[in-house]
Amino acid sequence: MSTPADKKIKTWQRAGAVVLALSVWQAASWTVDSALLLPGPVTVLGRLCALAVTAAFRRAVAFSFCRIAGGFALALVLAFVLALAAGRWPVVEVLLRPYVLAIKAVPVASFIILALIWMRTSALPLFISFLMVFPILYTNVLAGLRSADGQLLEMARAFRVPWRRQLHSILLPAVEPFLLAGCAAALGMSWKAGVAAEVIGVVAGSLGERLYDAKIYLQTADLLAWTAVIVALSALFERLVLALLRRGFRRLERGCGT
């Protein structure tokens, strides 16, 4: 168990790593000596502050966040439901396997181009973020269900324990580490895929459109500023979702213990 001193050391180490990275960036910017090729961190920070106070910035953040978060939430719910069904009825897994394998194998760019034919561009980030993270969440939840203690499940069936009670007391605790690991991998992927869809589809009012415009007009500082915004949103969203899931599992454990 880490002590307060250990935590303080880790905090200083992280801060030192950030300072080192910024120093390397600034040194590279001085070496290149071209704001077009590589603006320094101070220049990018200035552009970020200038963009952050505009209404267009807030609209773009809200637009992309709602759609990418919505796609992830939809994938999480559907993956959980279908994994439960596949765990209970093996035929469901057999029927779903070709689709899951296809989604894993097909390049995201192919899905984006197809989706541009099928739907409005405003729905593109939601659909692509959903599609890219669904297989990760589904396979992880299914693996968690299969890791549940078989003897406990047999005993529960022998004593005719209701399935809902089996779910709360046996299956969900087994799923927890697999689901958290899957979410940790899928959350970043949802933002990468969603923003890539926005850039390729030039989705109006999105963060991806801002990246595209910055590239077209050779505004490298703006490009890096918008990239920093996307990274920050992805990190905050990941921490929020994982914290909510952990809290939900803790409440479930307390409920099962009473």
What is each stretch, according to the model?
Residues 90, 181, 224-258:
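C-terminal transmembrane helix and the adjacent membrane-cytosol boundary/short C-terminal tail
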Residues 101-136, 143-144:
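Generic hydrophobic transmembrane alpha-helix motif, especially the helices
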